[in-house]
UniProtKB/Swiss-Prot annotation:
The gene is adk. It comes from the Bacteria. Residues 30-59 are annotated as: NMP. NCBIfam families: PRK00279.1-3, PRK14527.1, PRK14531.1, PRK14532.1. Consists of three domains, a large central CORE domain and two small peripheral domains, NMPbind and LID, which undergo movements during catalysis. The LID domain closes over the site of phosphoryl transfer upon ATP binding. Assembling and dissambling the active center during each catalytic cycle provides an effective means to prevent ATP hydrolysis. GO terms for biological process: AMP salvage. The lineage of its organism: Bacteria, Pseudomonadati, Pseudomonadota, Alphaproteobacteria, Maricaulales. AMP binds at residues 31, 36, 57-59, 85-88, 92, 133, 144. Disulfide bonds: none annotated. This is Adenylate kinase. ATP binds at residues 10-15, 127, 172. The keyword Transmembrane does not apply. Monomer. It comes from Maricaulis maris (strain MCS10). Its EC number is 2.7.4.3. PANTHER family: NUCLEOTIDE KINASE.
Length: 188
């Protein structure tokens, strides 16, 4: 099963993704983690990633897709993949659909974690304080939310047209959200 965990910064994607990995044995495909790992590994692809990132540039969709492609056999063997932080644009979603289709599989479900903006801001401010991120001010966090709603949220209609979006209330406890995700994954 291939699922996309979707929602704004602070909605709990990373937390719930790690939980699904622990409970179901699936592979988490977090683009941020994959970029850092590729860079640290020093492979040819990793050196390309490092050069791009060191130049202050965004890594292209093609390279991100290449990183995902490298991990798909592992995900297949594990029985599933959790896409966390990808796709972020319709172009990336189309590329992911094609990549999976070429391998005889697909995105099975898109779990949209719904959390109101004020709760998101509170969570992110708290996380910034706990993790010592002085740059994550409330203004910066609100800007990140604006970017999400402007650039990433338009993916919901893309996947909704395919009948794959399942909304889950992300306002509860971690256990309540996990139960909501489990129920959504059982829906056909």
């Amino acid at each position: 099963m291939n699922i996309v965990l979707f929602g704004p910064p602070g909605c709990g994607k990373g937390t719930q993704s790690k939980r699904l990995v622990a409970e179901r044995g699936w592979v988490q495909l977090s683009t941020g983690d994959m970029l850092r790992h590729a860079r640290a590994a020093g492979t040819e692809l990793g050196r390309r990633v490092a050069a791009i990132m060191d130049g202050g540039n965004l890594v292209s969709d093609a390279i991100v897709i290449e990183l995902i492609e490298e991990r798909l056999p592992e995900a297949k063997a594990a029985g599933g993949a959790i896409f966390d932080g990808f796709p972020r644009t319709v172009a990336q979603a189309q590329a992911l659909d094609q990549l999976l289709l070429d391998r005889g599989t697909q995105v099975d479900s898109v779990i949209e974690l719904k959390v109101n903006d004020e709760e998101l801001v509170q969570r992110l401010v708290k996380r910034a304080e706990e993790e010592g991120r002085p740059d994550d001010t409330e203004d910066v966090i609100r800007k990140r939310l604006e970017v999400y709603y402007g650039q990433t949220a338009p993916l919901i209609p893309f996947f909704a047209q395919q009948g794959k979006v399942k909304a889950v209330d992300g306002m509860g406890s971690m256990d309540e959200v996990a139960a909501g995700i489990a129920a959504a994954l059982e829906e056909k």
